[in-house]
Amino acid sequence: MNENLFASFITPMILGLPLVTLIVLFPSLLFPTSDRLVNNRFVTLQQWMLQLVSKQMMSIHNPKGQTWTLMLMSLILFIGSTNLLGLLPHSFTPTTQLSMNLGMAISLWAGAVITGFRNKTKTSLAHFLPQGTPTPLIPMLVIIETISLFIQPMALAVRLTANITAGHLLIHLIGGATLALMSISATTALITFIILILLTILEFAVAMIQAYVFTLLVSLYLHDNT
């Protein structure tokens, strides 16, 4: 457990050496580039996954919307790598901070909405009032649709923050329980350690899935406004 509420903001150190450089360079190690004519298996797998994700996300977009491909692929790589930072010992996950996620979500959401009002003003305004709405319900539905529109960035940020934070808290708690049980019951400690390993593997999957979900929702917002 942390000694105080501010312990997580202290620069992580090992043998008196700061780990900031290692933490900053860690994401780049996950996405190596090959200078050979024939790529190795890891680079080939990386390119295949990026092409698969790109194909799934951009299949719903028209030719004009295809221009967002580079931005969306950069976004999913950025979120995925920052999510994985928390699994590096003595490091900190930036995406557990609601302020960062909210700033990122609001910027992307606002860009999509402004693009929609600029390019398709009538269509964007029509989203506030579904077709065939009874006249007495028009004011209420306009208010509801407006609220739902402004809740979208909050939902994006809270979803990412909650899922990443919950996984890291579970790893922290089970890791502490494993250390406490080592002096009490070796068998129970071994079982808890196995659970910790499985949970860590699951957290790797959650980190990538949450990056995919965040980027997919941004892609859908862009699709509705382009």
Curated annotation (Swiss-Prot):
UniProt catalytic activity: H(+)(in) = H(+)(out)
Superkingdom, natural source: Eukaryota
Coiled-coil stretches noted in the UniProt entry, renumbered to this chain: none
Keywords, alphabetical: ATP synthesis, CF(0), Hydrogen ion transport, Ion transport, Membrane, Mitochondrion, Mitochondrion inner membrane, Transmembrane, Transmembrane helix, Transport
Keyword Mitochondrion found: yes
Molecular function via GO: proton channel activity; proton-transporting ATP synthase activity, rotational mechanism
Biological processes annotated in GO: proton motive force-driven ATP synthesis; proton transmembrane transport
Annotated PROSITE patterns: ATPASE_A (PS00449)
Transmembrane segments: 6-26, 68-88, 97-117, 138-158, 164-184, 200-222
Main location: mitochondrion
Membrane topology: Multi-pass membrane protein
One GO location term (cellular component): mitochondrial inner membrane
SUPFAM superfamilies assigned: F1F0 ATP synthase subunit A
Similarity comment: Belongs to the ATPase A chain family.
Quaternary organization: Component of the ATP synthase complex composed at least of ATP5F1A/subunit alpha, ATP5F1B/subunit beta, ATP5MC1/subunit c (homooctomer), MT-ATP6/subunit a, MT-ATP8/subunit 8, ATP5ME/subunit e, ATP5MF/subunit f, ATP5MG/subunit g, ATP5MK/subunit k, ATP5MJ/subunit j, ATP5F1C/subunit gamma, ATP5F1D/subunit delta, ATP5F1E/subunit epsilon, ATP5PF/subunit F6, ATP5PB/subunit b, ATP5PD/subunit d, ATP5PO/subunit OSCP.
Record's function text: Subunit a, of the mitochondrial membrane ATP synthase complex (F(1)F(0) ATP synthase or Complex V) that produces ATP from ADP in the presence of a proton gradient across the membrane which is generated by electron transport complexes of the respiratory chain. ATP synthase complex consist of a soluble F(1) head domain - the catalytic core - and a membrane F(1) domain - the membrane proton channel. These two domains are linked by a central stalk rotating inside the F(1) region and a stationary peripheral stalk.
Name this polypeptide is given: ATP synthase F(0) complex subunit a
Annotated organism of origin: Bos mutus grunniens (Wild yak)
Gene responsible for this protein: MT-ATP6
